[in-house]
From Swiss-Prot:
Pfam families: Acetyltransf_11 (PF13720), Hexapep (PF00132). Keywords: Acyltransferase, Cytoplasm, Lipid A biosynthesis, Lipid biosynthesis, Lipid metabolism, Repeat, Transferase. This is Acyl-[acyl-carrier-protein]--UDP-N-acetylglucosamine O-acyltransferase. InterPro entries: Acetyltransf_C (IPR029098), Acetyltransf_C_sf (IPR037157), Hexapep (IPR001451), Lipid_A_LpxA (IPR010137), Trimer_LpxA-like_sf (IPR011004). GO terms for molecular function: acyl-[acyl-carrier-protein]-UDP-N-acetylglucosamine O-acyltransferase activity. The gene is lpxA.
């Protein structure tokens, strides 16, 4: 275990022998640091935070501090982080709230660029790319492989679907369907994330089916329920389309159009 002599690792913290803790970093008493995780100088790991394997926390990141919620009264809420994530300089990640289930969750293989923020009770899937100064409000849910460009933001309780792309400076206030791109100060649909789907290894056949579903839902004159019914009738047996439809059906805030 490589712990710099100026680091503060409080009694009760569980640090794997293969982890590294840098100069003037602080690890709180309820923190668990997994194998091969590297905590940089001046970083802070607080709260009931669990980090998996191979994560890297850069200087001045604050991971696991209490939620920015006036209802919070010191309850023992958590932050659970998977493996191989990168938290760059100045990133802030809050623990959950009792009202939101008590846990903020981050998957594996994500990149959080400098000064980005993940609010309380967020659920982030695998492979997310969260660019500089992105702000995710409380209770936001990101499915796998979502990309947020710089200075974008998401309102509380919004859901962002798998392989969606949020352009820079975009304000998301409603759910963003899987495979879609949104842009603009008030997010509007800007087409499908074809490049992202190709990079994720989707075949041209699979991408073509998603395009068909997209056109029925967003380029016809049908209402949402009627469009969903048509998609299910014509394409619903295909996995990607079925996921697209389930997401649309599950919306509480409405769908970005």
């Amino acid at each position: 275990m490589a712990i710099h002599p100026t680091a503060v690792v409080e009694p009760g913290a569980q640090v794997d022998p293969s982890a590294e803790i840098g100069a003037l970093a602080v690890v709180g008493p309820h923190v668990r640091v997994g194998p091969r995780t590297v905590v940089g100088p001046h970083a802070v790991l607080a709260g009931r935070t669990t980090l998996g394997e191979g994560n890297r926390i850069f200087p001045h990141a604050v991971v696991g501090e209490v939620p920015q919620d006036l209802k919070y009264r010191g309850e023992p809420t958590e932050l659970v982080v998977g493996d191989r994530n990168t938290f760059r300089e100045g990133v802030t990640i809050s623990t959950g709230t009792v009202q939101g289930g008590g846990v903020t969750r981050i998957g594996s293989g994500c990149l959080f660029m400098a000064n980005s923020h993940v609010g309380h009770d967020c659920v982030i899937g695998d492979g997310a790319i969260i660019a500089n100064s992105v702000a995710l409000a409380g209770h936001v849910e990101l499915e796998d492989h979502v990309h947020f460009s710089g200075l974008a933001a998401a309102h509380q309780f919004c859901r962002i679907g798998r392989l969606a792309f949020v352009s820079g400076l975009t304000g998301v206030t409603m759910d963003v369907p899987p495979f879609c791109t949104v842009a603009g100060p008030r997010a509007e649909l800007a087409g499908l994330n074809a490049v992202g789907m190709q990079r994720a290894g989707l075949s041209e056949e699979r991408i073509g089916r998603v395009k068909q579903a997209y056109k029925i839902v967003f380029r016809s004159n049908l209402g949402l329920a009627e469009a969903i019914a048509q998609v299910e009738a014509e394409l619903g047996m295909h996995e990607d389309v079925a996921h697209f439809v389930r997401f649309l059906k599950g919306t509480q805030r409405g769908i970005t159009r």
